[in-house]
């Protein structure tokens, strides 16, 4: 993705820039071209009455005072849109996810969900609308069987078992896991476990879906 973006910005990527991994690539020579391209690129216009599903306004955050991790972050995502955030390790991608979910709180700025400020919303209240798939599936999975893991959130909310079965099967098919529906999680590869966690969030039908390192193990 980052190499494609550089090419669209008119950058001539060379082998000496070490483009194999974004963590090792020399990006400094291209920053100005990318910034200019980003500012000029036109995005599809949305209807005036449409509210963004998620909007981040002038967001600042630091773990240590005076050492900002995120500064002046501003973006909006409309319903049905996808946004990829690419950066080196430690750039603040997971930190941004944690801010949106309410695990940590910004030093400055606002996060709006469907036009409403969610600063006073609890983690549980945000979780009703925002689904987060973490980088490491082993940090999410708590049930030994695949079906039970994907069904857990629905059962906790008291969804009837017939509906649970229907919704779980649907998401397992989407994630390519239906043939393994009665398997133990321990029999899966890391990448397959990642898909189990994606299915367990999709089954809850969140308004916003955040995938932290979505291609890990795939």
Where are these regions (language model features)?
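The feature captures the beta-strand-to-loop junction immediately N-terminal to the Walker
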Residues: 86-88
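Helix-to-loop junction immediately C-terminal to a conserved catalytic motif
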Residues: 101
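Conserved ABC transporter NBD signature motif
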Residues: 109-117, 126
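Conserved ABC ATPase "signature" region
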Residues: 151, 155, 162-180
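Conserved ABC ATPase signature
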Residues: 184-188
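Conserved catalytic motifs of ABC-family nucleotide-binding domains
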Residues: 205
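Catalytic Walker B motif of ABC-type/P-loop ATPase nucleotide-binding domains
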Residues: 209-212
